[in-house]
């Protein structure tokens, strides 16, 4: 009986050590490890408006945001700001680092491509993720890259991409909302130390504890290399906001990230916010 208990204990210890090792390997060390781009897109898909989207990504039970960029021991509140031009929207996700500094986390880029078609991607900011990380909706039921097989279904349409079917997001409630004639571009009213009454910051989790909580968001979103929403990106670029504080705090992590990226064969990204081809992340 004692031998059996020892054996079981050894197995448990081995599995725990293996899981810890894998978590360490998957972490990039960049702040972006603590924000789920896939989770943000899922919240955007669920939200009926940009205002509701802002509330969802800042809700503790959604497990999308685990960022503490200024190191004060509390989760950062993420503002949403819509930069728009004609049928193009760039929803900027931004954190107030201090009274005088802000930092962009990511931007959701949306373009209307027809009367009832639209394409969307979220792009993680280079200062937060180490490089631009692009994620889009996928009908494939698994995270994939541009070389994977194409999906199918009523919400998909071709974008002249030989290997992928790009999801039509026009019928997402929030997308329909922003294309209404009476829509006024959403600009979050909140700022440093002035936040909505329903929101209370919480202490950030360690990466190995946070990652399993947002793991399920990866299933219906693809990490891709192709930047499809080019007009929206041009609209956003002049408004990009960077924080000196964030760049200073992440200088070492950014250097390590670049070394790891340079060593990777074929230019594959480090895997903190997504996996390679054929693997769920």
Task: Describe these PLM feature segments.
Residues 24-43:
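Short N-terminal segments immediately surrounding and downstream of signal-peptide cleavage
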Residues 76-81, 90-94, 107-109, 119-123:
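Soluble periplasmic/extracytoplasmic beta-strand elements of cell-envelope proteins
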